A protein has these predicted regions:
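N-terminal Rossmann-like or analogous alpha/beta NTP/dinucleotide-binding catalytic cores
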Residues: 1-112, 201-202, 206-219
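Structural motif
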Residues: 14-16, 176, 253-258
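Bulky hydrophobic/aromatic packing residues
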Residues: 26, 36, 43, 60, ...
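Active-site neighborhoods of enzyme catalytic cores
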Residues: 49-159, 166, 274-297
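Alpha-helix boundary recognition
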Residues: 86-90, 190, 251, 264
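Catalytic adenosine-cofactor/nucleotide-binding cores of aminoacyl-tRNA synthetases and other
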Residues: 100, 205-206, 216-297
């Protein structure tokens, strides 16, 4: 059985882009007769707030996007992440990193496409007597040419990524002790039996890192399906800074069926903005109808 999930971070009110991701994830799982899980990714103690999580759940119910399991809270799963971090450490797959953001930026110019900076492995082979102060924990990736990850995205097709040249050794625990996204999401997806991950294409490059990490932990990776982003007329992706498009503002102006209808039209699932419930949209759902280019809303 397909087991999809929606995993929002409670750092603010959901905006239309978040709702789009939730709707597509729900439609994809439910159209296959599957289950849909809700996981609250509240591992950042400085930015996550319980009240935002409660609002997210209220908004999902209001939109007709009911979940079958959860909510699961990442903030309650630290002991589990600790166990799997030790598994990696015992295999010699991790090391402490003392570099600051400024240190890393100074070693290499950002990739022109998205501003990423590939970590050069400065701390990878530091002798023990050089290891002082707070440290992040990084996951080793193979030497260049040996870390090729290939997978087929459910919407964007075959993907090939060289982890060494395109990603570098990545963080699995932050310097402040908080758990990094990559470790938490891989462990949770595996232990929760998630078989399908639907999310925005801005997270496409996270997939090879997660596939590699899952393999090192003996987990089977879910099927990844990335979707185009919703953008404004200037081509900028929608974000939580767009207060006019967050759920507080949208609920004052529209009924849930109107919001679903507008998103369905943007996705190419229907020809107009005609109001429709998420459940009534299920027969029309197909990934083949959705463009790969970002969508203007």
């Amino acid at each position: 059985m397909v087991r999809g999930r929606f995993a929002p971070s409670p750092t603010g009110r959901m905006h239309l882009g978040n709702v789009f991701a939730a709707l597509l994830s729900w439609l994809s799982a439910k159209s296959q007769g599957g289950k849909w899980l809700l996981r609250i990714e509240d591992i950042d103690p400085q930015r996550s707030h319980r009240e935002f999580a409660e609002l997210i759940m209220d908004d999902l119910r209001w939109l007709g996007l009911e979940w079958d399991e959860g909510p699961y809270w990442q903030s309650e799963r630290g002991d589990i992440y600790e166990h799997y971090l030790k598994v990696l450490a015992d295999k010699g797959m991790t090391y402490p990193c003392y570099c600051t953001r400024a240190d890393i930026l100074a070693t290499q110019a950002p990739h022109e496409s998205d501003g990423r900076v590939v970590y050069k492995g400065t701390c990878r082979n530091l002798p023990p007597d050089s290891r002082r102060g707070p440290a992040a924990i990084r996951m080793r990736v193979p030497e260049e040419g040996e870390g090729i990850v290939t997978f087929t995205d459910g919407h964007y097709g075959p993907q090939t990524v060289d982890l060494t040249s395109q990603c570098g050794d990545f963080i699995v625990r932050r310097k402040d002790g908080a758990w990094a996204y990559q470790l938490a999401v891989v462990v949770d997806d595996a232990l929760m039996g998630v078989t399908e991950v639907v999310r925005g294409r801005d997270l496409l490059l996270s997939s090879p890192q997660q596939i590699y990490l899952a393999g090192q932990l003996g987990f089977r990776s879910p099927h990844f399906i990335h979707h185009p982003l919703l953008c404004n007329e200037a081509g900028q992706r929608l974000s939580k800074r767009d207060r006019s498009l967050d759920m507080a503002a949208l609920r004052e102006r529209y009924a849930p069926e109107e919001i679903v209808g507008m998103l369905a039209r943007a996705a190419g699932l229907q020809a107009t903005d005609a109001p429709i419930t998420a459940a009534d949209l299920l027969p029309a759902f197909s990934w083949k109808k959705i463009e790969t280019a970002d969508l203007t809303f």
